[in-house]
Amino acid sequence: MIQQESRLKVADNSGARELLTIKVLGGSGRKTANIGDIIVATVKQATPGGVVKKGDVVRAVVVRTKRGARRKDGSYIRFDENAAVIIKDDKSPRGTRIFGPVARELREKEFMKIVSLAPEVL
């Protein structure tokens, strides 16, 4: 469960290392985001020579949460960290690689490029 001021790791090679959530998109007054939701965030840490710089305001999709998500069959998927992938306006990732596993819920929310780049889909 990601809310305003939440910090997330970045799971791609766009150059950002850590994000701070500014806003959760999708509805008036929406407070929290879960796996597959889009957020607006600012870059808090970045690597030198990356595509994005510290202080940039970006859009990102949440790919892993500590709280996890309940599936239709009754099972839960839960991760050790909160992580996101920085995306462009057309929902394609800014980076060319994805690090770590991503949840299957991204496939249902039509982030197919992220799913295809990920090393493992749980």
Curated annotation (Swiss-Prot):
GO terms, molecular function: large ribosomal subunit rRNA binding; structural constituent of ribosome
Ribosomal protein is among the record's keywords: yes
Taxonomy, superkingdom: Bacteria
Family of this protein: Belongs to the universal ribosomal protein uL14 family.
SUPFAM superfamilies documented for this protein: Ribosomal protein L14
Keyword list, A-Z: Ribonucleoprotein, Ribosomal protein, RNA-binding, rRNA-binding
Pfam families found in the cross-reference section: Ribosomal_L14
The organism's taxonomic lineage, starting at the top: Bacteria, Bacillati, Bacillota, Bacilli, Bacillales
Function: Binds to 23S rRNA. Forms part of two intersubunit bridges in the 70S ribosome.
Oligomer status and interactors: Part of the 50S ribosomal subunit. Forms a cluster with proteins L3 and L19. In the 70S ribosome, L14 and L19 interact and together make contacts with the 16S rRNA in bridges B5 and B8.
InterPro entries: Ribosomal_uL14, Ribosomal_uL14_bac-type, Ribosomal_uL14_CS, Ribosomal_uL14_sf
Organism: Exiguobacterium sp. (strain ATCC BAA-1283 / AT1b)
Name of the protein this chain belongs to: Large ribosomal subunit protein uL14
GO cellular component, as recorded: cytosolic large ribosomal subunit
One Gene Ontology biological process: translation
